[in-house]
């Protein structure tokens, strides 16, 4: 895995470059592209159901503001699942054109029609799709510190992964490293990924302390020497979020285990797959 031209392709929130993120359609497109795994984000509804959503609020990727005008600031944790399931989590893509793919002619009217009315998946639905597809997933648990779900979001996530028999095919990551300690305690079989915004003084020591398998840093401030040191110590390095082919080639040469990308087709092309 640490050879110069081999690395895992991770569809970041699904194939979100061309499909609304964190939807089952984004997952389907990522799978069809030939990726090794996909990454999703876990939050929770007010009534205790784990759902797949990146932001703390529903404003950017749903029509919650129009549908529930009095519920500002539209925090996902303040809505019951039944309410979340009424939201359109696909139409926003056409208005925002987040990666300029509509303007570039890469996403056309027919594709945009299929985005209308997409729903926020539950984690159960996402894991079910992954399991049935014989695929792998990186479950990122969003930091819910201060929210009602904080005491149980980790344990419920682990419980669901175990129920699907996916403890050994799922990587669980979080920027909240205490969550990773809780995952390890709840089910030691699950591999852990330590997400970091800022590089710790000693990444290898951090991984050992957490019992983590992989170091998951952002690309912007990452140095080649860090990747090499972590890999030499026997750990994996998954880098987020790498969308330009020149950057893909660069970190591939550094020995990255895998890359999170919004455009997995580009990375697959770089790899010659």
Q: PLM ranges: what are they?
A:
Residues 1-273:
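Phosphate-group recognition and catalysis centered on beta-loop-alpha active-site segments
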């Amino acid at each position: 895995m640490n050879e110069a031209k081999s690395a895992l392709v991770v569809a970041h929130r699904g194939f979100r470059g061309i499909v609304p993120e964190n939807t089952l359609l984004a997952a389907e497109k990522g799978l069809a592209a030939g990726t090794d795994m996909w990454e999703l984000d876990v939050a929770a509804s007010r009534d205790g159901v784990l759902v797949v959503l990146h932001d703390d609020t529903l404003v950017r990727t749903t029509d919650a503001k129009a549908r529930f005008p009095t519920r500002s600031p539209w925090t996902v944790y303040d809505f019951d699942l039944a309410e979340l399931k009424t939201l359109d989590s696909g139409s926003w893509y056409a208005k925002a054109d987040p990666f300029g793919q509509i303007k570039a002619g890469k996403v056309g009217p027919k594709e945009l029609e299929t985005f209308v009315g997409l729903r926020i998946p539950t984690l159960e639905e996402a894991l079910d799709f992954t399991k049935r597809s014989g695929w792998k997933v990186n479950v990122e648990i969003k930091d819910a510190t201060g929210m009602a779900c904080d005491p149980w979001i980790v344990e419920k996530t682990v419980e669901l992964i175990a129920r699907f028999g996916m403890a050994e095919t799922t990587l669980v990551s979080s920027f909240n490293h205490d969550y990773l300690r809780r995952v390890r305690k709840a089910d030691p079989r699950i591999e852990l990924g330590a997400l970091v915004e800022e590089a710790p003084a000693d990444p290898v020591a951090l991984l050992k302390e957490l019992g983590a398998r992989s170091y998951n840093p952002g690309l912007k401030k990452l140095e080649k020497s860090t990747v090499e040191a972590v890999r030499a110590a026997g750990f994996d390095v998954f880098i987020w979020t790498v969308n330009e082919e020149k950057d893909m080639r660069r970190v591939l040469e550094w020995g990255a285990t895998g890359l999170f990308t919004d455009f997995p087709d580009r990375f697959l092309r770089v790899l010659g797959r």
